[in-house]
Amino acid sequence: MTRPHVPVLADEVLDLLEPQPGETVVDGTFGAGGHARRIAERLGPDGLLIAIDRDPTAEARFDELAAEVSCRTRFIRADFASALEDLVAEGTRADGVLLDLGISSMQVDTFERGFSYSYDAPLDMRMDPGQELDAREVVNTWDERRLARVLRELGEERYAKQIARAIVRAREQRPLETTNALVEVIKDAIPAPARFAGGHPAKRAFQAIRIAVNGELEQLDRALPSAWALLREGGRFAGISFHSLEDRRVKRFLADRARGCICPPDLPVCACGRTAEAALLSRRAVQPTPEEIADNPRAASARLRAARKLRDGGSA
């Protein structure tokens, strides 16, 4: 079962990336192709859209898009960190790179893949169904301390210790096989008043387990330098994040590249020789309008940051 895909901050992405006829743009997280389609429509027959996704179901959607747009297209089935590194290694240069981070709507809405706490399904949560590690293994084999750390660090879950302890106790009786079974354990571990505050009680735990299964933060840490190295001088990067762990990484990365001289303020002449290699394209993260959130509630937590590359300063 799937719902119609609605790309988040679609107009804002186009405004900041400014794709032009004849350019090369990389969509590092193709998903359902909503952003890619709008970008491709601006590239014209001489432009090139390179789409990346590790989910095999995305490739069929890409084939449909490729048959309908006039620009040249290329699909790479891989995680975006590895694909971007490979593109840099082969000497590809891009005028724009987009990373729409986190889980795609089509993955959430394919209930049997186990990403959602709202529907019963096998515990899976793999973006690439071919990888070995899945949510069932995390929940049923990782020790209590490791589970608590994952819940605390990747989900910013206040009750990480209580939930981890409850998971271990529950699996001693029988393995946790389904999303509903995990949800019930989480609910029982949280104090009653907290179950009705701040959204679904399993939201943060599911986020943490999904991030751990897919190595999402490690992927992002590898991908950002490669995405930047891929850009030509004057090229533009845009990143959409959906939680603070991602947003902080994107913010720090772009701010570091937009920073010029780092000498002490009392030094009369610059000694470091450092100049900015990026210009931030918005002072703060761009957020969805109330109208977009009303039309697409999943957009509520989205944050968009973008920068233009001023010079080829490398990836470090």
Give the label of every model feature segment.
Residues 1-316:
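S-adenosyl-L-methionine-dependent methyltransferase catalytic core, i.e., the SAM/SAH-binding region
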